[in-house]
């Protein structure tokens, strides 16, 4: 057992450091932390737009009242289980929640929310995300010690911003960091 103090990051946002993670799915990624315990962690990348889908056809919603396609962006939440879909959304929608974070955000993963969004009865803000990111026990803590991630409080404006390409840059600005001056030689005090 380690003598290190465990800090629960559930409900926080991880910001990939600009020069340490230089390629792949985590390069310049933002991850909303769904769960972080001593057994491991799970999060959703929310700035990797991969496509747009029609909710009606994707979820096979059988309702003649919806005549036009309801197009929504689809985000890649991580490298694990791409067949699983999640709606990260504002907490104004509270039917059959998978997770409620009590910070104005919630997660749903059911057909009902897709139908409600298609009918205009869903949450005010939502992202449809497939797959997720997971860490085994101690793995995220090691990555944090290596300065692969910065941690910031949840910010709904970043999560639901219209331009996914600018979310990471805006998160750095919010933290008071200019990417140009960010050193690849990071140490611990």
Curated annotation (Swiss-Prot):
Gene3D superfamilies: VC0467-like (3.40.1740.10). InterPro entries: AlgH-like. NCBIfam families: PRK00228.1-4 (NF001268). One of its GO terms (cellular component) is cytosol. Pfam families: DUF179. Belongs to the UPF0301 (AlgH) family. It comes from Rickettsia canadensis (strain McKiel). This is UPF0301 protein A1E_00140.
